[in-house]
């Protein structure tokens, strides 16, 4: 097996909760609590879960936009969090992030040609005379025309702005792209176009994606493997086909039951979860999902389930499986 492009081992990210004039730490928000992920070159791994499950924090911590609390993150065998700022800067172009909101991720006062080409100059990847050609290439790869280069963000639609965001990541020729809810702010018809663009770029450039989303119907079209997060922990991981055909964790089953079926005559039994997602400051003892699980037993309230292989490379953290 080839060397993994990205290895995340037992990653934890806790944010301190402070109180009083002296900002005394009184607790921690356990945004990410013992997550492990491996991505092979050319693979797309989908990370799904409700809002507040810690998906985006995983992505930001992998890119070292925020420091980890514990665990290990290796990119091409290099421990990201052990690098000095100068060493990290050298590999930054190889790892890029696509933001969720195409409206706020672009500076309204900066022409898109400058927004896309700025990183090329910052990293010294080409001369000033070559920037424009590199930007043209990135724009055209993302379905935009070269004459758009001197326009401002307000002159584009939401879908076009997201294409600009993709071009900004693509211009550095990265190997890994972390896409944080890249289609959630777009209309459904535009979502399909952007998903197809991601697939096309992966095939032509050999990109590796960590695709973060709350929508299982979106990751089904793009991802080869899927991980389901809840309250900072991984509940289940499996290949796309295995997860959709044979979901094992009650939380995964509930998420899948909410995915619309395109055939009106077919009906899926809806699993409605009770209550709200608990606070990550004081998560429940035992299985974090037991407060909302319709099948919870006494063991679920006291013992943390082991994340284990249930067969066919299908991993799940549940006492009932």
Predicted regions and their residues:
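Short catalytic/signature loops enriched in Gly
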Residues: 2-4, 18-23, 237-321
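ABC ATPase NBD coupling module
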Residues: 22-25, 80-96, 122, 242-247, ...
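Conserved ABC transporter NBD signature motif
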Residues: 71-79
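Conserved ABC ATPase "signature" region
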Residues: 79, 130-147, 253-257
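Conserved ABC ATPase signature
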Residues: 152-156, 160
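A short, proline-enriched helix->beta-strand linker immediately N-terminal to the Walker B motif
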Residues: 171-175
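P-loop NTP-binding/switch modules centered on Walker-like glycine-rich loops
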Residues: 178, 182, 186, 190-268
């Amino acid at each position: 097996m080839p060397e993994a492009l990205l290895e995340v081992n037992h990653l934890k990210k806790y944010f301190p909760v402070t109180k009083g004039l002296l900002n005394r730490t009184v607790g921690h928000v356990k945004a990410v609590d013992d997550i492990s992920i491996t991505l092979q070159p050319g693979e797309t791994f989908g990370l799904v879960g409700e809002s507040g499950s810690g998906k985006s924090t995983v992505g930001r911590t992998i890119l070292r936009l925020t420091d980890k609390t514990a665990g290990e993150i290796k990119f091409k065998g290099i421990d990201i969090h052990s690098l000095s700022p100068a060493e990290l800067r050298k590999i930054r172009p190889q790892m890029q992030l696509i933001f969720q909101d195409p409206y706020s991720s672009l500076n309204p006062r900066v022409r898109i040609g400058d927004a896309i080409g700025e990183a090329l100059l910052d990293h010294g990847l080409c001369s000033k005379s070559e920037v424009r050609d590199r930007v043209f290439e990135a724009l055209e790869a993302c379905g935009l025309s070269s004459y758009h280069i001197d326009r401002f963000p307000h002159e584009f639609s939401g879908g076009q702005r997201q294409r600009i965001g993709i071009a900004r990541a693509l211009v550095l020729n990265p190997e890994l792209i972390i896409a944080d809810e890249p289609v959630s702010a777009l209309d459904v018809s535009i979502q399909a176009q952007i998903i197809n663009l991601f697939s096309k770029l992966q095939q032509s450039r050999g990109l590796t994606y960590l695709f973060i989303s709350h929508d299982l119907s979106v990751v089904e079209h793009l991802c080869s493997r899927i991980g389901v997060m809840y309250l900072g922990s991984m509940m289940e991981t499996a290949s796309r086909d295995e997860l959709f055909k044979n979901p094992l964790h009650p939380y995964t089953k509930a998420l899948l039951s909410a995915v619309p079926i395109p055939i009106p005559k077919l009906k899926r039994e809806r699993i409605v979860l009770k209550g709200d997602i608990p606070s990550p400051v004081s998560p429940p003892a035992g299985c974090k999902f037991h407060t909302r699980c319709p099948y919870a037993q006494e063991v679920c309230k006291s013992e943390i389930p082991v994340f284990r292989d249930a067969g066919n490379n299908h991993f799940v953290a549940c006492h009932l499986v």
